[in-house]
């Protein structure tokens, strides 16, 4: 890329045009329901609009100017150059895949106050065998499970917790199905803040629970579900000076929009036709939609992708809303082994619904056996993910079968969590101890054959080389007969 003048001059021009946006008045908060706009210091402790109880989104001056003929927006080419240049920096803030794009999230009075674990910069994997199984030519996976604490929550937590630290809070808290608590506890520890985690007793994976304890959080298990934990915490933040870090906090979404920037940068600023996202509390879908929309407003991309959201059949309030002719959101009692999306009353459902409607995607659901099969198929690619992530591939196969996604479309799955987040699920699957008879009965003959071929239970043998050799010979002969898809 060629510019007039030397690199220092280009850098000066880029920073000069963005400098005003890095001040404390560079953004406001707008209610997504009634449109009321407030300053950041006027927001309530529960991040709800006092007029309509809606959620806020962060708005910037350049978003308002984008519609005008004389917008004076930052130069898209210069921004791309600047973000690439930061990759060679030794500064922690530049090595972060979130704060490297800080020009598009000026939420701190001083960017040097960012609390970072060098999150982001996650890989974009090619999935050729999964693409073939789904009936499409081109499939990638943006693996957010490769973040420091193993999930996409890190990208949002670095942003929101940095705001909490800069504003002088000592205590932070969240309700969680596991990933949010792990991320919050880690970033709070990094910042020297005290953290409180509320989790539903017996309803999150042990690997996630161990993280919040290891990072020093006060971990409280409540005899309720996730939505019950949210209600308790919402009451507590009104009584004590605790900074709420659930996804109702709009600064979480500012960090969680950055994988959209990373994705198109990794694709040489080309936009895939379709993004498929798992749906739990639904803030991630909303954040990605915001990221793509802002890139289009700034001229970084020419168009936005479709975004489809997939939910577990046992935790599917958005899917039910999507298929309800009256479009009424009705909370459900969530029940799925994909614990990260075991949420029956998602806080960000309206934002996510807007993303589907505005960007032209769909909402689907996947059964427990479909999720388990999809997880095993992704694992067979050498990638791996937690169960909630696999719902994307299960849903993709349905969307292709329905003709909603065509063979030629470029599709990206958002994998939100690492496979080690719920290792017991994986062990139970391969030992054929995960699914019930009723769940297995829902599988087609082809799906049952796939399950049988993908399960790899450990074998226990006598410590005898002849026995081991005979077993290996038998296994190798079978492997030649049953070739992987």
Model-derived regions: residue spans:
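N-terminal amphipathic/basic-hydrophobic helices that include classical n-h-c signal peptides
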Residues: 1-21
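PLP-dependent amino-acid enzyme catalytic core
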Residues: 20-485
């Amino acid at each position: 890329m060629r510019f007039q003048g030397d690199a220092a001059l280009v850098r000066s021009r880029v920073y000069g045009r963005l400098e005003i946006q890095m001040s404390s008045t560079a953004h406001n908060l707008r209610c997504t329901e009634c449109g009321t706009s407030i300053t950041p210091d006027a927001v309530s402790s529960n991040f709800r609009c006092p007029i309509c109880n809606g959620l806020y989104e962060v708005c910037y001056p350049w978003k308002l100017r984008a519609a005008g003929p004389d917008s004076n927006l930052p130069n898209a080419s210069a921004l791309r150059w600047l973000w690439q240049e930061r990759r060679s920096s030794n500064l922690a803030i530049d090595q972060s895949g979130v704060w490297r794009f800080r020009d598009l999230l000026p939420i701190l009075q001083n960017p040097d106050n960012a609390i970072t674990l060098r999150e982001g910069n996650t890989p974009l994997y090619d999935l050729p065998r999964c693409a073939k199984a789904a009936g499409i030519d081109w499939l990638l996976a943006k693996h957010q499970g490769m973040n420091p604490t193993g999930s996409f929550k890190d990208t949002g937590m670095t942003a929101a917790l940095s705001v909490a630290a800069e504003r002088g809070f000592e205590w932070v808290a969240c309700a969680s199905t596991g990933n949010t608590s792990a991320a919050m506890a880690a970033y709070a520890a990094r910042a020297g803040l005290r953290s409180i985690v509320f989790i539903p007793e017996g309803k999150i994976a042990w690997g996630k629970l161990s993280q919040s304890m290891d990072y020093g959080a006060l971990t409280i298990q409540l005899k309720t579900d996730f939505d019950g934990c949210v209600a308790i915490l919402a009451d507590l933040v009104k009584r004590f000076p605790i900074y709420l870090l659930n996804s109702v906090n709009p600064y979480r979404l500012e960090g969680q929009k950055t994988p959209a920037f990373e994705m198109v940068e990794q694709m040489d600023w080309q936009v895939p036709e379709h993004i498929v996202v798992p749906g739990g509390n639904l803030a991630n879908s909303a954040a990605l939609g915001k990221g793509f929309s802002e890139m289009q407003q700034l001229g970084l991309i020419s168009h936005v992708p479709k975004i489809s959201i997939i939910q577990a059949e046992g935790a599917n309030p958005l899917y039910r809303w999507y298929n309800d002719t009256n479009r009424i959101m009705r909370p459900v009692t969530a029940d799925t082994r994909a614990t990260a999306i075991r949420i029956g009353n998602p806080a960000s459902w309206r934002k996510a619904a807007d993303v589907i409607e505005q960007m032209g995607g769909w909402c689907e659901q996947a059964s427990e056996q479909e999720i388990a099969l999809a997880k095993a198929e992704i694992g067979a690619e050498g990638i791996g993910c937690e169960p909630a992530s696999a719902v994307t591939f299960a849903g993709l196969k349905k969307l292709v079968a329905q003709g909603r996604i065509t063979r030629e479309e470029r599709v990206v799955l958002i994998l939100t969590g690492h496979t080690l987040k719920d290792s017991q699920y994986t062990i139970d699957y391969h030992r054929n101890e995960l699914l019930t008879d009723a769940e297995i009965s829902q599988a087609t003959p082809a799906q049952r054959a796939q399950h049988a071929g993908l399960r790899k239970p450990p074998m226990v043998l006598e410590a005898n080389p002849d026995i081991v050799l005979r077993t290996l010979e038998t296994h190798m002969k079978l492997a030649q007969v049953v070739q992987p898809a």
